[in-house]
Swiss-Prot record:
Any one Pfam family match given in the protein's UniProt record, by short name: GrpE
Main location: cytoplasm
Name the record gives this protein: Protein GrpE
Complex formation: Homodimer.
PANTHER family: GRPE PROTEIN (PTHR21237), GRPE PROTEIN HOMOLOG, MITOCHONDRIAL (PTHR21237:SF23)
GO molecular function, one term: adenyl-nucleotide exchange factor activity
Low complexity bias locations: 16-33, 218-245
A Gene Ontology biological process term: protein folding
Gene3D superfamilies: 3.90.20.20, Head domain of nucleotide exchange factor GrpE
Compositional bias (Polar residues): 246-255
Amino acid sequence: MTVIEVEASGPSTPVEAEASASPADTTSPPSDAEATPSEDVAALRQEVESLKAQLEFSQAKGRETMERLREAHERAKEAQERTVRHAADLENYRKRAQKEKEEVQRFGSEKLLKDLLPVMDNLDRAIDAAAKSPDLDSFEKGVAMTRKSFEDALGRHGVKGFSAKGQVFDPRVHEAIQQVETADVPAGHVAYEVVRGFYLNERLVRPAMVVVARAPAEPVAAAEPPAVAEPATATTDTEAPAAPAQSENSSGGSQ
């Protein structure tokens, strides 16, 4: 076929060319239109499923959060109840302690009093015996026994006396009220004990009042008698007037 034949076989006018091409153009768009709705439906379904999954996850998290809040509320409620109970227990303990303190202040010396009452009974018996019998020896023995029972009663409560006579003076446990010169006791030692000291459970409750020894003062030496003039001193005194005479002779010779 020649070129002239090809050109003759093609469309002669633009309208014919458009008419010949129109069937192909009208058939292609419907295929695209048919595919679009199915893709949209699939995308919508996928989005719905995603939203449902997110909703279920959010609901699950919400239920979990609510459960945690409920548990936290229960724990807070229990903690508050415990705090209220502890506060009540503390208040009750404070009241009991205050009551016990008041009882100790009022009746703390009850045991000591029970131990001292027999001492008073012994003193009453000693006074009655002295009134009935003037025997001083028996009275002295009774007083000594009463004193011993009194000291034993104090000892049961931790009270203990101590002797200071002959000891080195210690200002921590001794109170000096006087000093005395004596050679019988070393200086700085206790010569006499006026009042005994006492301990209460190793604590000093009263120092011992004592008189402290001091070394006797040395005697003052006797005054020496005045010195007597010696004879040699007298001779010197007699020779003293001779000097002026000699001076007179010497003065005459010079004349």
